[in-house]
Amino acid sequence: MTNPWNGVLTATATPFKSDLSIDYDKYAEHVAWLAENGTHGVIPNGSLGEYQVLTADERAKMVEVAVAAAPKGFNVVPGVAAYGAAESRKWAEHAQKVGAGAVMLLPPNAYRASDDEVLAHYKEVAKVGIPIIAYNNPFDTKVDLTPKLVARIANEVPNVVAIKEFSGDVRRIWQIKKLAPRIEVIVGADDVFLELSTAGISGWIAGFPNALPKESMELYNLAISGNFKEAAPMYAALHDVFHWDSKKEFIQAIKLGMDHVGRYGGPTRLPRLPLPQHEQDQIHREMDVALAYFKNR
């Protein structure tokens, strides 16, 4: 791909053993498998990777394992989110040191930062010099990177090159393109991918390629080539599954989807508990529908 943040980047799940320690061998194998199945890169230590419940040593090793397992040309873009800029900067420095091509950065966590504070946060981490994907997730961070704020960041923080847009508002891409034209827009939620792809996107940071990489890549390639006649029914078959990516239970759901196709999803760490049985059954049914589409077409 042209840049490390282009194409389909899988926000990877962290594989925990039954004792909730990390299985780094399984993670390395998963990174290699995603590359073999045509995706363009991985994002360790994102929201899906449960970065909030990893120790500092675990978080560092996840990035190091991903970089070591990635074949040539396969991108590793670690999440570097933290409560404050000092810690985020530390993780950005580590990512740069071990060979990552870019990082993904949320606004300050758990604090309703003002626009000026958000801007200061990005400026501090940008001092590292590595390209930054800003990540808008107002549901988890209490901060909304509005198009006007994105424009300020674009004007004042040159190292911010793109934004992962997870607000769910499909109209925002047009506002961002108008107000911050140099910022590349990356789809941040699986269940609005096709809608946003019509507006000209630079990539897709996705959850369900953890379970459905070939299927997700086929959809992506159809959409970016403008073949919506074929992409639309495929997206419809996938959409019930994809919608879990926008629910608070998305980590458990995606890990269950991985288990469904014979991959290793495994458990989550507290505070996340296993899903109720009726929700597990629903995900299995929806995975069956998605897989049947590709089998029977």
Set out the residue ranges of the language-model regions:
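Secondary-structure boundary/capping signal
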Residues: F74-N75, I133, V161, E184, ...
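Generic structural "secondary-structure junction" signal
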Residues: P15-S18, V53-A56, P147, L194, ...
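General structural feature for long, well-ordered alpha-helical segments within catalytic domains
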Residues: D23-K26, H30, E58, M62, ...
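C-terminal alpha-helical cap/extension of soluble enzyme domains
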Residues: P4, L9-P15, W33, N37-T39, ...
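Charge-dense, low-complexity intrinsically disordered segments
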Residues: S21, V53, D57, R112, ...
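Short, flexible micro-motifs
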Residues: T10, P44, G49-Q52, A82, ...
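Catalytic alpha/beta core domains of metabolic enzymes, predominantly
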Residues: V128, F139-K248
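Active-site beta->alpha loop and helix N-cap motifs at the rims of alpha/beta catalytic domains
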Residues: T2-K142, R152, M258, R297
